[in-house]
Amino acid sequence: EKNMHKPFIHCFKTAKEYYVYDVNTDKIIQVSFETYNFLENNIWDEKAEREIEKLINEGYLKRTRVEEVKHFATDFLESYLENRMNQLVLQVTQKCNLRCSYCVYSGDYKNRNHSQKEMSWETAKEAVDYLYGHSMSSEDIYISFYGGEPLLMFRLIKEVVEYVKREYCQRTVHFNLTTNGTLFTPEIVQYFIKNNIQIMFSLDGPKEVHDKNRIFAGSNRGSFEKLRDSMKMIYSMDRKYYKKNVSFNTVLDPQNELRTIYEFLDKDRLISKNLSRISVLNDNYTDKQCEFSGEFVEEQEYEYFKCFLSKLKRINEKFVARA
């Protein structure tokens, strides 16, 4: 049973210091050993008494217990759903021209497989209309195209963009797309530039790393060179668009050397100035077990350590991997 007469706190210590987490103020306070010993073990000390009195006067160590945790927006949830939706993700197809080894549709994940399913225009239109009807209080709206490989349905993407421009021209709508980058043509690039569509490329690292997992369907041919050609094409057609609208999603395979990937992302001229989002391959919801090499874990933890040091101003940020 909880002691309702004790302050609502949690005491903890490190190798050298003592702390109190004050729940009601959501703050961590460094205290003396004497105060820690009194609050944790009820061992009285004159020094502790003075320090505790000071903390109480500053608003800490209250006995109030939380009876209900409730988000401040809970009472407005229905209104948000009716008027403040701001994002729509359209899975325009489940088809893909690649067979990435860790894809959720590869057959290794529970309840997911590649299929030939495509979204109809009627479904896409209905979804867009629903978003519009439930976003009247949202200043900006975001529509994302996803797959499979969404560029296999470029025709539908164009239909959606043109419909939104025609019917909802008074709204600020942002379009974005996640792609393996192998199907771009000058026509598609020009259309994306014209409509300011943001592109997120799936890129796992240099050629030998990327091609290990991202191969074309029906072959063992890697997709790096084709993706690279698309990046160069967009950059050559409109550098400002490229710098503003192109980003990268990188999946780290724990069997690869982390340093090689970080150096590639940091130094490549078509990548280093653009935003990269990185995630580590895991075996959640899959029948395959993901194995981590000792070198990968060591390098990853070292980069985390350097990141913390940079936040403490102990080292310059330039020594921390940008990714």
List PLM regions with ranges:
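A cross-family glycoside hydrolase active-site/sugar-binding cleft signature
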Residues: 89-91, 142-146, 176-180, 200-204, ...
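Glycine-enriched alpha-helix->loop->beta-strand junction motifs that scaffold or abut catalytic
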Residues: 193-199, 270-272
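Conserved radical SAM core fold
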Residues: 109-110, 150-152, 181-186, 198-220, ...
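Active-site cores of enzymes that catalyze phosphoryl transfer or operate on phosphate-rich substrates
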Residues: 95-102, 202, 223, 227
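N-terminal [4Fe-4S]-dependent radical SAM core
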Residues: 5-21, 25-30, 49-89, 107, ...
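Conserved alpha-helical substructure of the radical SAM core
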Residues: 73-190, 194-195
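Auxiliary Fe-S-binding modules of radical SAM enzymes
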Residues: 1-25, 29-44, 290-292, 304-306
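Radical SAM enzyme [4Fe-4S]-AdoMet core and its adjacent flexible, acidic
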Residues: 208-228, 232-323
